[in-house]
């Protein structure tokens, strides 16, 4: 059995060792450990391997909290002490910036982190009927598999949501559409918890009674979605608490639907918004752009400063709700929202929006390379970039520095998803 010394973690939280110049990626191994491993896939330049035995453990190794860890794909790092996870993600960010973009920030910001358990306020859970038993499986997919993990509880979900996993199995198994249920979305707000069920066929009266009884027993709200995301509607109860989240520091509340993108981790999102605003430093006299603005998670806090803000987003539905949130929070006079496909941005289309003193960019995983390449002679003097993919951040940062003349002032990791390999980050760029 081959033995290796683990050097570091890759972007999927696999340990990396080397044998005769070839990289070996070992599931479950931690930096500094000496391990036995067994390769299950061999390529000319690398191998993928399973961990067989830890000969010399890392001081960061801990016993996983969850009995499903190692099978369930919802987490990848429970065997690593939480502060060590954050440090590893900071290193992944630094490595990505250098190896992909060939750039380094002048300063590394301290990472943003929060509670490691019960943080996941939004989740899409897979559902499948088990033909032999007639029961249902509900949970995340197994590690690198299309199968659904047989989980009875989940430590990264809020406790009251984890407690719904088994009752949901019983509910879905009893529905006439049980065979055709593929997933259920969970969205936790300040005042209520919503479950969203995609239905391809109409519910029977008996199905509707079962859903209503489940709601009454478990204090949740059920949404149904017969077709695309815009068809989702609140099924039961028709009234009651709204699904919303708050940014108390800015006196803001955002209503949303289970189909809307919102940050998974409410506590870390509050810290992230606070840091983004501190780094952006909006002033009442400034005109600021919030690109990929979504519901206005950053737009409305910027508007609280008195600056004039333009929020740009590709989804007309999100822009509509952003306008509603601005009005509900008394900020309609400070905010303008517009619909634009920022993945097809040109210098001409960006210039048509007018001159901006500063810009905040919060793109999806694909990044914002078209947008940053479109920045012309009236470039914003400061850009704060919130990223959910270190690779595309590194690519876009290289464009800003080498092609657009920005200084790469600072960057730091954001641990939005504890116990996973997912790395979010925030970066600041300034013109000299």
Swiss-Prot record:
Residues that bind [4Fe-4S] cluster: 66, 72, 75, 154
GO terms assigned for molecular function: 4 iron, 4 sulfur cluster binding; iron ion binding; RNA binding; rRNA (uridine-C5-)-methyltransferase activity
Family listed: Belongs to the class I-like SAM-binding methyltransferase superfamily. RNA M5U methyltransferase family. RlmD subfamily.
Protein name per the record: 23S rRNA (uracil(1939)-C(5))-methyltransferase RlmD
UniProt domain TRAM: residue ranges: 1-53
Signal peptide boundaries: none
Entry keywords, A to Z: 4Fe-4S, Iron, Iron-sulfur, Metal-binding, Methyltransferase, rRNA processing, S-adenosyl-L-methionine, Transferase
One Pfam family here: tRNA_U5-meth_tr
Superkingdom of source: Bacteria
Catalytic activity: uridine(1939) in 23S rRNA + S-adenosyl-L-methionine = 5-methyluridine(1939) in 23S rRNA + S-adenosyl-L-homocysteine + H(+)
Gene3D superfamilies linked to this entry: 2.40.50.1070, Nucleic acid-binding proteins, Vaccinia Virus protein VP39
Role according to the record: Catalyzes the formation of 5-methyl-uridine at position 1939 (m5U1939) in 23S rRNA.
Active site per database record: 388
Record-listed E.C. numbers: 2.1.1.190
GO terms of biological process kind: rRNA base methylation
Binding site for S-adenosyl-L-methionine: 263, 292, 297, 313, 341, 362
């Amino acid at each position: 059995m081959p033995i290796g010394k683990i050097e570091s973690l890759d972007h999927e939280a696999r340990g990396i060792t080397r044998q005769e110049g070839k990289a070996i990626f070992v599931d479950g191994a931690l930096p500094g450990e000496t391990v036995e491993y067994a390769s299950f896939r061999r390529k000319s330049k690398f191998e993928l391997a399973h961990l067989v035995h830890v000969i010399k453990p890392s001081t960061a190794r801990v016993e996983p909290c969850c009995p499903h860890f190692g099978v369930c794909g919802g987490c990848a790092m429970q065997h690593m002490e939480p502060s060590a996870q954050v440090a590893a993600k900071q290193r992944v960010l630094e490595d990505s910036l250098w190896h992909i973009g060939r750039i380094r920030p002048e300063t590394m910001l301290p990472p943003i982190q929060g509670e490691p358990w019960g943080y996941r306020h939004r989740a899409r859970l897979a559902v499948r009927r088990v033909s032999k038993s007639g029961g249902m499986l509900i949970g995340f997919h197994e590690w690198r598999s299309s199968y659904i993990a047989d989980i009875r509880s989940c430590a990264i979900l809020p406790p009251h949501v984890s407690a719904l996993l088994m009752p949901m199995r019983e509910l879905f198994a009893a529905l006439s559409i049980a065979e055709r249920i593929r997933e259920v979305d969970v969205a936790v707000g300040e005042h209520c918890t919503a479950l969203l069920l995609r239905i391809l066929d109409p519910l029977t009266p008996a199905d509707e009674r079962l859903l209503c009884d489940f709601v009454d027993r478990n204090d949740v709200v059920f949404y149904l979605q017969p077709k695309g995301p815009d068809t989702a509607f609140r099924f039961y109860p028709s009234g009651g608490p709204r699904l919303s989240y708050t940014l108390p520091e800015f006196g803001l509340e955002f209503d949303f639907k289970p189909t809307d993108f919102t940050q998974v981790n409410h506590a870390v999102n509050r810290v992230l918004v606070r840091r983004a605003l501190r780094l952006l430093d909006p002033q009442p006299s400034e005109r600021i752009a919030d690109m990929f603005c979504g519901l206005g998670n950053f737009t409305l806090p910027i508007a609280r400063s008195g600056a004039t803000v333009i929020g740009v987003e590709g989804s007309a539905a999100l822009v509509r709700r952003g306008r509603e949130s601005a009005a509900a929070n008394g900020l309609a006079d400070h905010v303008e929202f517009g619909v634009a496909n920022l993945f097809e941005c040109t210098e001409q289309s960006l210039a048509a929006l007018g001159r901006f003193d500063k810009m905040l960019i919060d793109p999806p995983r694909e990044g914002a390379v078209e947008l940053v390449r479109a920045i012309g002679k009236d470039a914003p003097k400061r850009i704060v970039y919130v990223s959910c993919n270190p690779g595309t951040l590194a690519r876009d940062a290289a464009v800003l520095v080498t092609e657009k003349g920005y200084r790469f002032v600072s960057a730091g990791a954001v641990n939005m998803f504890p116990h996973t390999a997912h790395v979010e980050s925030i970066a600041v760029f300034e013109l000299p």
